Amino acid sequence: MAKISPTQRSLEYLREQGYHVEIVEKWNHWARIRQDLWGWCDLLALRKNEVLAVQVTASAVATRIKKIQDSPTVQFVRDAGIRIEVHGWRQNSKGEWVIRVEDIS
């Protein structure tokens, strides 16, 4: 069975919450790296009167929060009224995937 990425898990989670979601990271062929929107955003989610930017990780939520807070773009995003969340995914003792959502708007 194919392994489901944290990004795919967050896509499903957000769609269940009623968001229209798109992946906004891209593959830079020349540098051979993934580049996130604004340097930290993996997903952009829309719902009536709401825009949500999401950074997704398998772990290291605190590291991702610091990365966003240190970003020169984060204040522009906040000033635009865009909410910001970090989604951390892990397996619990039963082997079930659970999400940790940190709102850092």
Which residues make up each language-model segment?
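Catalytic phosphate/metal-binding cores of nucleic-acid and nucleotide-processing enzymes, i.e., regions
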Residues: 1-105
